[in-house]
A protein has these predicted regions:
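Amphipathic alpha-helical polymerization modules
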Residues: 2-72
Length: 72
C-alpha cells in the first residue's frame, strides 16, 4: 500500500480508538485522572495525524494543480 493509504488507515484506526474511549467514559463515567490523560493523549495523537494528513493532501493538490497549469 502507498504511504498515503497507510496514513489514512492509521487515522481511521485512531478515530475508532478515540470513539471507543469516549463511549466507555459516557457509559460508566471517568474512572481516574490517568484515564482522562489517556483519552487526551489519544485525541491529541489523532488530531496531529489528521492535521499532517490534511497538509499532505493540500500540498499534493497544489502540486497537481501547478503541474496541470504548466502543461496547458
Amino acid at each position: 500500500p502507498s504511504p498515503l493509504k497507510k496514513s489514512l488507515e492509521k487515522v481511521l484506526q485512531q478515530e475508532s480508538e478515540v470513539q471507543n474511549h469516549l463511549k466507555k467514559v459516557m457509559k460508566r463515567g471517568v474512572g481516574s485522572m490517568e484515564e482522562l490523560l489517556n483519552i487526551q493523549m489519544s485525541v491529541y495523537r489523532y488530531t496531529q495525524h489528521v492535521e499532517l494528513l490534511s497538509k499532505t493532501v493540500d500540498r499534493s493538490t497544489q502540486c497537481l494543480k501547478q503541474t496541470l497549469q504548466t502543461r496547458l
